Amino acid sequence: LMRKDVDTLTD
């Protein structure tokens, strides 16, 4: 995951 994705995704 990319850091921005961590904020929106939970995988």
From Swiss-Prot:
It is found in: Secreted, Extracellular space. GO terms for molecular function: metal ion binding; oxygen carrier activity. Hemolymph. Binds 2 copper ions per heterodimer. Coiled coil: none annotated. Keywords: Copper, Metal-binding, Oxygen transport, Secreted, Thioether bond, Transport. Forms a thioether bond between 2 amino acids. Its cofactor is Cu(2+). GO terms for cellular component: extracellular region. Belongs to the tyrosinase family. Hemocyanin subfamily. Heterodidecamer composed of A and B subunits, each containing 8 globular oxygen-binding functional units. Heterogenous decameric or multidecameric structures may also be formed. Hemocyanins are copper-containing oxygen carriers occurring freely dissolved in the hemolymph of many mollusks and arthropods. This is Hemocyanin subunit A. It comes from Concholepas concholepas (Barnacle rock-shell).
